[in-house]
Amino acid sequence: MSRKPLIAGNWKMNLNHYEAIALVQKIAFSLPDKYYDRVDVAVIPPFTDLRSVQTLVDGDKLRLTYGAQDLSPHDSGAYTGDVSGAFLAKLGCSYVVVGHSERRTYHNEDDALVAAKAATALKHGLTPIVCIGEHLDVREAGNHVAHNIEQLRGSLAGLLAEQIGSVVTAYEPVWAIGTGRVASAADAQEVCAAIRKELASLASPRIADTVRVLYGGSVNAKNVGDIVAQDDVDGGLVGGASLDGEHFATLAAIAAGGPLP
C-alpha cells in the first residue's frame, strides 16, 4: 500500500520559545499548504517551546503538527522532572519520541522503559515514534539487522497488535547521528524492510503494511529523495537540518515528490 511520508524535525535541546515561534513561522512561510496533501510534517521541540508552538499552530490554523521529545511512563505523581503524556496531549501534541539513541546512551534507557513509554503514549492518544539503531561496531561486525530486530521486539513488548499499528518506528544508526555520515539508501532499506517483516510477525502483515518506518541520521535535502524512494522507508526523523526553516521545508517538499517550493 501507499503510506504517506512523515518528515519529523527533532530540535533536540535547541531554541528557546521565541526562537521556536520564528522557526515555525519560517517553515509555514516556506512550505505552502498544497504539500501537506502528500507529506505529513511535524516539529519536535523541547518541552519549554510546546505551548508557544501550540498557540501559533492553532492561531494561524497551520497544517504543521508537533510533538515532544520524551515522556514519563507515569501518568502523574511524585516524579520530579518527568512530563506526563496527559500534559502533552492537553498541549495538542500528535507525536512523542521514545527510545532515541541519546536517551538510551546518556540516560541509560533500556528497551523495557521504552516499551513502557510507548504504551503510555498510546494510552493518552499520542503516536510514539519508537527509535532503534546500532552503533558502528555492530554495523561493522555485520550484526546490525539482528541487533535492530531484537531492539524492536523489546521496545514494543507488551503492545497488542492493533496498538503496534498506531506506532511509528524510526531506524537511526547511531554512527550516523550528527556525524555527517549517512547510511546509504540501500542500507536504510535493508534495515527498514527487516523492521516491517518483524512487525508483520509481531502484529500481522496487514498492520505492518500500514506502519510508517522512518530513517534518521544526518538526513538533509540532498539525500532525502533517495532515502524516501526506498520501498520500506516512509520518511525521516531529521535532526540538525530541521533547525533551518527553509532547508527543512525544502526537505519536506522533496519527500512529497516535489516540485521545490
From Swiss-Prot:
This one is known as: Triosephosphate isomerase
Query: What keywords are assigned to this protein?
Result: Cytoplasm, Gluconeogenesis, Glycolysis, Isomerase
Q: Signal sequence: where? A: none
Which cell locations does it reside in?
Cytoplasm
Catalytic activity, EC: 5.3.1.1
The family database entries (Pfam families) matched by this protein are listed as: TIM
**GO BP annotations listed:** gluconeogenesis; glyceraldehyde-3-phosphate biosynthetic process; glycerol catabolic process; glycolytic process
Q: In which pathway does it act?
A: Carbohydrate biosynthesis; gluconeogenesis; Carbohydrate degradation; glycolysis; D-glyceraldehyde 3-phosphate from glycerone phosphate: step 1/1
The main enzyme category here is isomerase
GO CC field: cytosol
Q: Where is the active site?
A: 100, 172
Which residues pair up as cystines? none
Detail which positions bind substrate. Answer: 10-12, 178, 218, 239-240
So what family is this one in?
A: Belongs to the triosephosphate isomerase family.
Name the chemical reaction catalysed here. D-glyceraldehyde 3-phosphate = dihydroxyacetone phosphate
Report a single Gene Ontology molecular function. Answer: triose-phosphate isomerase activity
The free-text function statement in the UniProt record for this protein reads:
Involved in the gluconeogenesis. Catalyzes stereospecifically the conversion of dihydroxyacetone phosphate (DHAP) to D-glyceraldehyde-3-phosphate (G3P).
Task: Summarize subunit and interaction data from the UniProt record for this chain.
Answer: Homodimer.
User: Which NCBIfam families does the entry mention?
Assistant: tim
